[in-house]
């Protein structure tokens, strides 16, 4: 069994810490990776963090994860609400999937209330800031370990 967890991030998350800090905070994607790597290492796992502004590239990473990862944490960002293609790719992945959002999408614009990814996700975290990623990694570690 692989002990790698893929952490996939969608559009504009490369600007984390710079874009709308009143919503997304001041920490960066590098901070997310560092914090997730620490949590995973405590449990004997490793992480591979990836970000893309391009839907097809995210799908390619999900396909790669089929052979290389025990679980996926995904923040599809705006693709959450629009991408049946990402949903279909996640359906082809057999391990656990946790959907993670930094902000509480249910307190925001109504178009953000629907998630295609939730149809596949084993759990959803929203509104916990980047701590949500750490919680997601803890849960994925547990699920990958059979818990």
From Swiss-Prot:
UniProt-recorded Gene Ontology molecular function terms: 3-dehydroquinate dehydratase activity
Reaction(s) the record says it catalyses: 3-dehydroquinate = 3-dehydroshikimate + H2O
Binding positions for substrate per the UniProt entry: 75, 81, 88, 102-103, 112
GO BP term (any one): quinate catabolic process
EC number: 4.2.1.10
One Pfam family here: DHquinase_II
UniProt KW keywords: Amino-acid biosynthesis, Aromatic amino acid biosynthesis, Lyase
SUPFAM superfamilies the record matches: Type II 3-dehydroquinate dehydratase
CDD domains: DHQase_II (cd00466)
Residues annotated as catalytic: 24 (proton acceptor), 101 (proton donor)
Site (Transition state stabilizer): 19
Pathway entry: Metabolic intermediate biosynthesis; chorismate biosynthesis; chorismate from D-erythrose 4-phosphate and phosphoenolpyruvate: step 3/7
Keyword Transcription tagged: no
PANTHER family xref list: CATABOLIC 3-DEHYDROQUINASE
The protein's assembly and partners: Homododecamer.
Family: Belongs to the type-II 3-dehydroquinase family.
Function: Catalyzes a trans-dehydration via an enolate intermediate.
Name of the protein in its database record: 3-dehydroquinate dehydratase
Organism encoding this protein: Cereibacter sphaeroides (strain ATCC 17029 / ATH 2.4.9)
Organism taxonomic ancestry: Bacteria, Pseudomonadati, Pseudomonadota, Alphaproteobacteria, Rhodobacterales
Gene from which this protein is expressed: aroQ
């Amino acid at each position: 069994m692989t002990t790698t967890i893929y952490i996939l991030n969608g559009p504009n998350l490369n600007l984390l810490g710079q874009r709308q800090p009143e919503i997304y905070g001041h920490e960066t994607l590098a901070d997310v990776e560092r914090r997730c790597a620490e949590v995973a290492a405590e449990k004997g796992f490793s992480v591979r963090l990836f970000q893309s502004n391009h839907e097809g590239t995210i799908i390619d990473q999900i396909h790669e994860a089929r052979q290389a990862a025990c679980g996926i944490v995904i923040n599809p960002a705006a693709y959450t609400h629009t991408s049946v293609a990402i949903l279909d790719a996640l359906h082809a992945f057999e391990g656990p999937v946790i959907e993670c959002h930094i902000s509480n999408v249910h307190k925001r614009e109504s178009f953000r209330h629907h998630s295609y990814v939730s149809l596949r996700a084993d759990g959803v975290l929203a509104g916990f800031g980047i701590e949500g990623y750490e919680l997601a990694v803890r849960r994925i570690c547990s699920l990958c370990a059979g818990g």
